[in-house]
Protein backbone atom coordinates (compact mmCIF):
# COMPACT_ATOMS: atom_id res chain seq x y z
CA UNK A 1 0.00 0.00 0.00
CA UNK A 2 1.36 3.43 -0.92
CA UNK A 3 1.46 6.36 1.45
CA UNK A 4 -1.17 8.09 -0.70
CA UNK A 5 -3.42 5.04 -0.63
CA UNK A 6 -3.20 4.77 3.14
CA UNK A 7 -4.10 8.48 3.46
CA UNK A 8 -6.96 7.91 1.03
CA UNK A 9 -8.26 4.92 2.99
CA UNK A 10 -8.00 6.85 6.27
CA UNK A 11 -9.79 9.86 4.80
CA UNK A 12 -12.62 7.72 3.41
CA UNK A 13 -12.95 5.97 6.78
CA UNK A 14 -13.08 9.34 8.57
CA UNK A 15 -15.64 10.72 6.09
CA UNK A 16 -17.76 7.60 6.53
CA UNK A 17 -17.53 7.73 10.32
CA UNK A 18 -18.62 11.38 10.25
CA UNK A 19 -21.54 10.61 7.92
CA UNK A 20 -22.37 7.50 9.94
CA UNK A 21 -23.48 9.85 12.74
CA UNK A 22 -26.41 11.06 10.63
CA UNK A 23 -29.58 10.38 12.65
CA UNK A 24 -31.70 10.36 9.47
CA UNK A 25 -32.03 7.00 7.76
CA UNK A 26 -32.72 5.90 4.20
CA UNK A 27 -33.08 2.40 2.78
CA UNK A 28 -29.87 1.01 1.32
CA UNK A 29 -29.70 -1.33 -1.66
CA UNK A 30 -30.27 -4.31 0.65
CA UNK A 31 -33.38 -2.70 2.18
CA UNK A 32 -31.67 -1.98 5.51
CA UNK A 33 -31.54 1.45 7.12
CA UNK A 34 -28.36 3.40 6.39
CA UNK A 35 -27.49 6.90 7.65
CA UNK A 36 -28.69 9.21 4.87
CA UNK A 37 -25.46 11.06 4.14
CA UNK A 38 -23.41 7.87 4.33
CA UNK A 39 -25.66 6.33 1.69
CA UNK A 40 -25.37 9.46 -0.45
CA UNK A 41 -21.56 9.38 -0.17
CA UNK A 42 -21.51 5.72 -1.17
CA UNK A 43 -23.72 6.48 -4.16
CA UNK A 44 -21.40 9.33 -5.17
CA UNK A 45 -18.38 7.02 -5.00
CA UNK A 46 -20.18 4.35 -6.99
CA UNK A 47 -21.13 6.90 -9.66
CA UNK A 48 -17.66 8.39 -10.07
CA UNK A 49 -16.37 4.85 -10.45
CA UNK A 50 -18.77 4.32 -13.35
CA UNK A 51 -18.66 7.81 -14.88
CA UNK A 52 -14.96 8.63 -14.46
CA UNK A 53 -13.10 5.50 -13.32
CA UNK A 54 -9.70 7.16 -13.70
CA UNK A 55 -10.67 10.31 -11.79
CA UNK A 56 -7.89 11.91 -9.76
CA UNK A 57 -7.68 11.08 -6.07
CA UNK A 58 -8.73 14.61 -5.11
CA UNK A 59 -11.93 14.30 -7.16
CA UNK A 60 -12.69 10.92 -5.59
CA UNK A 61 -12.29 12.44 -2.13
CA UNK A 62 -14.40 15.46 -3.07
CA UNK A 63 -17.33 13.37 -4.26
CA UNK A 64 -17.22 11.30 -1.07
CA UNK A 65 -17.26 14.48 1.05
CA UNK A 66 -19.83 16.45 -0.98
CA UNK A 67 -22.55 16.37 1.73
CA UNK A 68 -20.42 15.52 4.75
CA UNK A 69 -22.47 15.99 7.93
CA UNK A 70 -25.08 17.98 6.01
CA UNK A 71 -27.71 17.44 8.70
CA UNK A 72 -25.73 19.69 11.06
CA UNK A 73 -26.78 22.73 9.00
CA UNK A 74 -30.56 22.33 8.66
CA UNK A 75 -32.38 24.21 5.93
CA UNK A 76 -34.72 25.80 8.46
CA UNK A 77 -31.78 27.50 10.18
CA UNK A 78 -32.03 30.07 7.36
CA UNK A 79 -35.01 32.11 6.13
CA UNK A 80 -37.42 29.89 4.17
CA UNK A 81 -37.33 31.97 1.01
CA UNK A 82 -35.12 32.00 -2.09
CA UNK A 83 -32.50 34.26 -0.53
CA UNK A 84 -32.41 32.06 2.57
CA UNK A 85 -32.02 28.99 0.38
CA UNK A 86 -29.08 30.53 -1.45
CA UNK A 87 -27.47 31.58 1.85
CA UNK A 88 -27.95 28.05 3.19
CA UNK A 89 -26.32 26.51 0.11
CA UNK A 90 -23.37 28.91 0.28
CA UNK A 91 -22.95 28.18 3.99
CA UNK A 92 -23.05 24.44 3.28
CA UNK A 93 -20.30 24.72 0.68
CA UNK A 94 -18.00 26.27 3.26
CA UNK A 95 -19.06 23.85 6.02
CA UNK A 96 -18.51 20.78 3.83
CA UNK A 97 -15.15 22.06 2.56
CA UNK A 98 -13.87 22.87 6.06
CA UNK A 99 -15.08 19.55 7.48
CA UNK A 100 -13.49 17.58 4.63
CA UNK A 101 -10.25 19.53 5.01
CA UNK A 102 -10.06 18.92 8.75
CA UNK A 103 -10.61 15.19 8.32
CA UNK A 104 -8.11 14.99 5.46
CA UNK A 105 -5.50 16.70 7.65
CA UNK A 106 -6.19 14.08 10.31
CA UNK A 107 -5.73 11.38 7.65
CA UNK A 108 -2.28 12.75 6.81
CA UNK A 109 -2.86 14.67 3.59
CA UNK A 110 -0.68 17.59 2.52
CA UNK A 111 -2.06 21.11 2.32
CA UNK A 112 -2.05 21.19 -1.51
CA UNK A 113 -4.30 18.12 -1.78
CA UNK A 114 -6.54 19.41 1.00
CA UNK A 115 -6.91 22.76 -0.77
CA UNK A 116 -7.72 21.02 -4.05
CA UNK A 117 -10.51 19.00 -2.42
CA UNK A 118 -11.80 22.02 -0.51
CA UNK A 119 -12.05 23.98 -3.76
CA UNK A 120 -14.14 21.26 -5.37
CA UNK A 121 -16.36 20.64 -2.34
CA UNK A 122 -16.69 24.41 -1.85
CA UNK A 123 -17.93 24.71 -5.47
CA UNK A 124 -15.14 27.10 -6.42
CA UNK A 125 -14.24 27.41 -10.06
CA UNK A 126 -17.24 25.60 -11.48
CA UNK A 127 -16.76 25.33 -15.26
CA UNK A 128 -13.01 26.08 -15.00
CA UNK A 129 -11.91 23.68 -12.23
CA UNK A 130 -12.05 20.11 -13.53
CA UNK A 131 -12.50 18.62 -10.04
CA UNK A 132 -15.40 20.95 -9.24
CA UNK A 133 -17.06 20.26 -12.58
CA UNK A 134 -16.63 16.50 -12.16
CA UNK A 135 -18.15 16.69 -8.67
CA UNK A 136 -21.17 18.54 -10.07
CA UNK A 137 -21.55 16.09 -12.95
CA UNK A 138 -21.45 13.12 -10.57
CA UNK A 139 -23.92 14.80 -8.19
CA UNK A 140 -26.31 15.40 -11.10
CA UNK A 141 -26.09 11.76 -12.19
CA UNK A 142 -26.68 10.54 -8.62
CA UNK A 143 -29.69 12.83 -8.35
CA UNK A 144 -31.15 11.52 -11.60
CA UNK A 145 -30.53 7.88 -10.70
CA UNK A 146 -31.61 7.91 -7.05
CA UNK A 147 -33.56 11.03 -6.12
CA UNK A 148 -35.29 12.70 -9.08
CA UNK A 149 -38.53 10.72 -9.04
CA UNK A 150 -38.99 11.17 -5.29
CA UNK A 151 -38.23 14.88 -5.60
CA UNK A 152 -40.68 15.30 -8.48
CA UNK A 153 -43.35 13.45 -6.48
CA UNK A 154 -43.00 15.99 -3.68
CA UNK A 155 -43.35 18.91 -6.09
CA UNK A 156 -46.63 18.44 -7.96
CA UNK A 157 -46.57 22.12 -8.99
CA UNK A 158 -43.33 21.60 -10.95
CA UNK A 159 -43.99 21.47 -14.66
CA UNK A 160 -41.79 19.77 -17.23
CA UNK A 161 -40.44 23.19 -18.23
CA UNK A 162 -39.41 23.94 -14.67
Model-derived segments and spans:
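Sequence termini and other peripheral, non-core segments
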Residues: 1-6
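Active-site flanking loop/helix segments enriched in acidic
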Residues: 7-45, 78-87, 91
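A broad detector of short, well-ordered amphipathic alpha-helices
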Residues: 9, 60, 94-98
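Alpha-helical phosphate/pyrophosphate-handling elements in metalloenzyme active cores
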Residues: 31-59, 100-107, 112-115
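Structural motif
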Residues: 36, 52-57, 129-136, 157
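His-Asp-centered metal-binding catalytic motifs of divalent-metal-dependent phosphohydrolases/nucleases
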Residues: 57-76, 80, 100, 119-125, ...
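Histidine/acidic-rich helix-loop-helix segments that form or flank divalent-metal centers
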Residues: 63, 110-154
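Divalent-cation-assisted or electrostatically stabilized phosphate/pyrophosphate-binding catalytic cores
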Residues: 78-99, 155-162
Amino acid sequence: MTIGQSCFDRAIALFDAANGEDPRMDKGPDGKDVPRELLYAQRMTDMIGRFAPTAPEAAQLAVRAQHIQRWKVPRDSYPMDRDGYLQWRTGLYKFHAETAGRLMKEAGYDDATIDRVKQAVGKRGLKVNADTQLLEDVADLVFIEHYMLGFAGQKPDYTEEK
